[in-house]
A protein has these predicted regions:
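N-terminal secretory signal peptides and thylakoid transit peptides that target proteins
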Residues: 1-16
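An N-cap/entry alpha-helix motif that binds or orients negatively charged groups
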Residues: 35-116, 222-263, 399-401, 407-412
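Conserved, mostly hydrophobic/aromatic
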Residues: 68, 125, 146, 204, ...
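Glycine-rich active-site/cofactor-binding loop and its immediate structural neighborhood
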Residues: 120-156
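Glycine-rich beta-to-alpha transition loops that act as phosphate-gripper elements at the mouths
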Residues: 157-160, 181, 280-287, 333-346
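Acidic (Asp/Glu)-rich catalytic clusters
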Residues: 163-171, 294
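Alpha/beta enzyme core
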Residues: 189-315, 320-336, 352-354
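C-terminal helical cap(s) of enzyme catalytic domains, especially alpha/beta-barrels
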Residues: 317, 323, 368-386
Length: 412
């Protein structure tokens, strides 16, 4: 299949007008097959610049082609056989959008407010570690892209660039994602550093416990451990956490995972007492835990299963939103990530009760493909798609997106 025909088929597959188009025999099926194909296309079919992308999926094969197999496997696989990761994506198919007609949608407002700060879009950048593993500019490129497109950004504990440098590149402080350290003194040290850097919010992660079985990644890493300069700092691999800028001043082992303890609600209260930053808990997926989060003084609830990277056989995060929203009952903002690939996904998550919606792998595809322009293009595409579905559904502001805008196919 030549590149032009492939691009045309992908464009057709992404269109809501497919049922109404008089396509030649077999074209609709071919379009669907093209959109679903996970094989890396020939180099002649890869986009050559970020500006050529029609959807965020166009960046995925470019990133795969550019990255060493070991790096790509780490980014693209999930826990066990990646079932939870796949469920995150497929979960959005359960919901369909109800469109209203004859509404003046000449002006659409995509802005949201979080903790008295206004953002131009509810789409934010979820925490992902080790950006320099995928592009030499790493988190600096991501921060500049987030700044230029006015998106909220959450920085990972295992960032390969310090929070101070990221904030300088961005021009304003990011939110900071925190793993529990085994020693409270180390956690306290991290909190003070992040607080001194001006970060307004701390995102405490509780969805990565007891290790993880990265079966597919391990199969690839056994076959290929190709080295590259981007993975090394001062001659040492960045997988050694002692080289990570937010951890190198602490007593950290050389293991490829943070030293994650076993957090409890008492620990959450301890965090709350230790800082003036807003505190969110990342990894909440049930009503019971959402209610406990509010009872323990949490300022925000973050629905996540770590992109399906840590826990297997979990529900897709999109199917947890309504339940968690019932537990929160409007008392705190709700963030969610997992499987977000389209503007319609953002819309559905908001309709179910989310306040803001995070993307992870897509912007990393953009970063690995073209650096800062790639991240910017991913954010632009998602925002345009989100604006489009708002207009198509007759909604003029994010506040107008609610449960009446979607239908649960399993209950209709």
């Amino acid at each position: 299949m030549d590149a032009d025909r492939r691009r045309l088929l992908q464009l057709i597959a992404s269109s809501s007008l497919v049922p109404f188009l008089e396509l030649p025999d077999g074209w609709a099926d071919a379009a669907h097959a093209s959109a679903q194909s996970s094989a890396t296309p020939p180099d002649s079919e890869l986009i050559a610049s970020a500006a050529e992308a029609l959807s965020v999926f166009d960046f995925e094969p470019v990133a795969r082609a550019k990255l060493p197999p070991w790096h790509w496997a780490w980014l693209s696989t999930g826990g066990d056989g990646s079932e939870t990761m796949q469920a995150n994506r497929e979960g959005f198919e359960r919901y369909q959008i109800r469109a209203r007609r004859l509404v003046d949608v000449s002006k659409v407002d995509t802005s949201v407010r979080l903790f008295n700060q206004s953002w131009e879009t509810p789409i934010f950048l979820s925490p992902v570690g080790g950006h320099r593993t995928y592009n030499p500019d790493g988190e600096l490129a991501t921060a500049r892209a987030a700044k230029s497109k006015r998106h909220l950004q959450v920085l990972s504990t295992v960032t390969t660039t310090s929070v101070e440098d990221v904030n300088a590149a961005r021009g304003e402080p990011v939110w900071f994602q925190l793993y529990q350290r085994d020693e409270w003194g180390q956690t306290r040290q991290l909190i003070k550093r992040v607080e001194s850097a001006g970060c307004p919010a701390l995102v405490f992660t509780v969805d990565l416990l007891g290790g993880r079985n990265m079966e597919q990644f391990n199969r690839v890493s056994q076959r290929n451990r190709q080295q590259c300069g981007a993975c090394h700092l001062n001659g040492q691999p960045l997988t050694d956490l002692r080289n990570r800028p937010m951890l190198n001043a602490l007593s950290v082992s050389a293991t490829p995972q943070p030293e994650i303890g076993t957090p409890t609600w008492d620990y959450v209260k301890r965090l709350k007492d230790a800082t003036g930053m807003k505190l969110l808990v990342k990894g909440i997926v049930t009503r019971e835990d959402a209610e406990l989060a509010i009872q323990n003084g949490v300022d925000g609830v973050y629905i996540s299963n770590h992109g399906g990277r840590a826990e297997n056989s979990l529900r897709p995060t999109v199917q947890c939103i309504s339940e968690v929203a019932a537990g929160v009952a409007g008392r705190a903002p709700i963030l969610v990530d997992g499987g977000i690939r389209r503007g319609t996904d953002v819309y559905k998550a908001l309709a179910l009760g989310a306040t803001a919606v995070g993307v992870g792998r897509p912007y990393m595809w953009g970063l690995a493909s073209f650096g800062q322009p790639g991240v910017e293009a991913v954010l632009d595409i998602l925002r345009r798609e989100f604006q489009l579905i708002m207009r198509q559904s007759g909604v003029t502001s994010v506040r107008g997106i609610g449960a009446t805008q979607i239908v649960d196919r399993q209950r209709s």
